[in-house]
A protein has these predicted regions:
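Bacterial Sec-dependent N-terminal signal peptides
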Residues: 1-24
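Phosphate/dinucleotide-binding and metal-coordinating scaffold of catalytic cores
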Residues: 23-348
Length: 348
């Protein structure tokens, strides 16, 4: 019976695992996201004017100063706007959407990127930069889970804020995220901009996403309602592409709250409590993805350790690493895996 199960698992992996092999090596990553070293940039902005005068369709002109390969500052003309309704209302710094023209980026390591997201700390508070590093950690852990992911790049920001006749300079951590069009191009896919029921999305890709959201203890997402996620059509499969993880338990930001975007009973009040929000699917596929995560455990902790040097409070790093390890303790325990994941999967 055990041999029969193993044969079935190999067969399932051969069928559904083709998604991985078909996507590896497709397209090229732009120079901006081909390296891990942080980029140094400088922005001169009025936060008040940015929030007041920009919206989903209205951008303002600005200059992005950055250190080039020669360690000398260069500059790009950009258009930018604040993004994220919740962050605009509740955060001091809103995340930014950047638009860059092809003629301006030609010959720079920004070439090939027409649009970018820039994640900033939410509030002026202790640990604000460490929250950014932990969210970056989430993105980079997801890179290990699946090739269908956003590329990211850490940035050190000299943020010069204009306040009337005064200027206030803050040293912030942030990171750039590639545009969804670049992700689709890199993977020879296409973005789907309409809602599609979760159970109509690819089984294995959906389980990978659900496991990952459970790993970071994130409730602030919905693949059906496209809340903090996109859908890509790749190799005749509909694949979820998640983003925005600052409300997760891994990040554990001071402003984070449990989300009930999917209108299901969660029975938790703390973002650090995990609850599995994925759907019931073939148990063999659950076992396949479980094995994938366990096999990638060492790679994940290598990624976590690589980010340690960027933390200002080393205790924040220790807590984050311990939090991820707790996920693997569940995954590697048959009883815990059944009780906390398999038995909790949703039917509707």
């Amino acid at each position: 019976m055990k041999n029969f199960f193993l044969i079935l698992l190999v067969w399932v992996y051969a069928i559904y695992g083709n998604l991985l092999s078909a996507q590896n090596g497709i397209g090229e990553t732009t120079a901006l996201f081909s390296k891990q070293e942080p980029i140094f940039i400088k922005l001169n902005l009025s936060v008040k004017e940015l929030k007041k005068n920009t919206n989903d369709s209205t951008f303002m002109e600005s200059i992005l100063y950055y250190k080039n390969e020669m360690e000398a500052y260069d500059s790009l003309k950009i258009d930018l706007r604040a993004r994220g309704n919740n962050r605009r209302e509740n955060c001091y710094y809103a995340p930014l959407k950047l638009k860059l023209s092809k003629s301006v980026t030609k010959g720079t390591f920004f070439e090939g990127n027409k649009e970018l997201k820039l994640v900033l700390p939410c509030l002026i508070e202790s640990n604000n930069n460490d929250y950014v590093i932990k969210e970056l950690m989430a993105y980079q852990l997801y890179e290990i889970v699946t090739p269908v992911h956003y590329k990211t790049r850490l940035v050190n920001i000299e943020f010069v804020e204009e306040k009337g006749k005064r200027t206030i300079t803050k040293d912030l951590k942030g990171f750039l995220i590639e545009d969804v069009d670049n992700v689709a191009k890199r993977l020879n896919g296409k973005e789907i901009k309409r809602r599609i029921l979760a159970l109509q999305q690819d089984d294995v890709a959906s389980i990978r996403n659900a496991f990952f959201q459970y790993l970071i203890a994130n409730t602030d997402f919905s693949t059906t309602y496209l809340h903090n996620g996109k859908l890509l059509f790749i190799d005749k499969k509909i694949i979820p592409l998640p983003y925005d993880f600052d409300m997760s338990g891994l990040v554990d930001a001071s402003y984070a709250v449990v989300s009930n975007i999917q209108n299901i009973s969660l029975d938790i009040t703390d973002v650090k409590e995990r609850v599995y929000k994925g759907y019931k699917r073939d148990v063999l596929l659950f076992e396949q993805v479980r094995k994938e995560f366990i096999d990638n455990k060492s790679k994940m902790f290598e990624t976590i350790d690589r980010l340690e040097k960027y933390f200002e409070d080393k205790n924040q790093f220790i807590i984050a690493k311990r939090f991820v390890n707790e996920f693997f303790e569940i995954l590697q325990n048959d009883t815990a895996f059944k009780n906390k994941i398999l038995d909790q999967a949703r039917e509707d």
